[in-house]
Amino acid sequence: MHIRIGTRSSKLAMIQAMMVKDRLDSLGIETEVKGFTSKGDINLDSPLYSIGGTGVFVDDLNRMILKNEIDIAVHSAKDIPSFIDDSLEISAVLKRDDPRDVLISQHSLNDLEASSVIGTSSLRRIKELKTLRNDILIKDLRGNIDTRLKKLDNGDYDGIIMAKAAYDRMRINRRHFILNYDDFVPAPNQGIIAIISKKDSEINDVLKKINDDETYNDMKAERLILSGLNLGCSKPVGIYAHKNRIFMRFYSLKNDDYKDIVMDYNNIDLEFIRSEIHDYGY
């Protein structure tokens, strides 16, 4: 068996694809990694949420699976839209890495001076920042991680926010501050590397051997909220499943309000959640 692994060509995406390749190689499977540039990598002038959210990083690769140009696609699970083509599935995930966010800066969030400039393109992070520090400035930040760090070094920003999992996978060594769960509820599926394939592919039997069951169940619970409420990838929502509990934070699109909800993730009540956020503009 020979498996063609598709991924974005960014350094982080290639690292994640190689993590999957290494696990398949350990099973004696012949693999190759193919890197591609996505629409989201080309359009760096617009805020991410204005061009379709993180799903723009996923769609092109998924189409390549359907065209038989690649066999599987490796994605950051948080980038995968709530709904994908009916003939595709998330067939496996690797064990979840730290789902929290980090602030890369010389100063902690509490110690930043007023009017400090923080870079992020995430509506969730923007809302979280404004809730905690409405005296700082938030500036859109796009590009791969090396580009973002260069902009930080050039003085365009006083700090930037990124996923702790990405920070660790890239082996970045900079002064940083981990943002706790209470203040920054992680994005749904943050820290999870997911593999998409055709539902009827014989490759899926192999992929099951590298799947982490606990992470897969957490991923499904978080995605159930996204799909059940038709939230998509770009809404200001934090969702984190852990040890059979699911923690949710919904930020209003109309004002600075937010709602925290906690449930047993084996008994998710979508109607209750919908009633709690009915006037949030989703």
Curated annotation (Swiss-Prot):
Taken from the record, one Pfam family name reads Porphobil_deam
Q: Which residues carry this modification: S-(dipyrrolylmethanemethyl)cysteine?
A: 233
Which top EC class is given? Answer: transferase
Q: Which domain of life is it from?
A: Archaea
Q: Which GO terms describe its cellular component?
A: cytoplasm
**Reaction equation(s) it catalyzes:** 4 porphobilinogen + H2O = hydroxymethylbilane + 4 NH4(+)
Cofactor section = dipyrromethane
Q: Which GO terms describe its molecular function?
A: hydroxymethylbilane synthase activity
Q: In which pathway does it act?
A: Porphyrin-containing compound metabolism; protoporphyrin-IX biosynthesis; coproporphyrinogen-III from 5-aminolevulinate: step 2/4
- Annotated GO biological process: protoporphyrinogen IX biosynthetic process
The record's comment on cofactor binding reads:
Binds 1 dipyrromethane group covalently.
The Enzyme Commission number assigned here is 2.5.1.61
Q: Which UniProt keywords apply?
A: Porphyrin biosynthesis, Transferase
Biological role? Tetrapolymerization of the monopyrrole PBG into the hydroxymethylbilane pre-uroporphyrinogen in several discrete steps.
Family according to the record: Belongs to the HMBS family.
Its UniProt miscellaneous note says: The porphobilinogen subunits are added to the dipyrromethane group.
Q: What is this protein called?
A: Probable porphobilinogen deaminase
Origin species, per record, is Picrophilus torridus (strain ATCC 700027 / DSM 9790 / JCM 10055 / NBRC 100828 / KAW 2/3)
Q: Which gene encodes it?
A: hemC
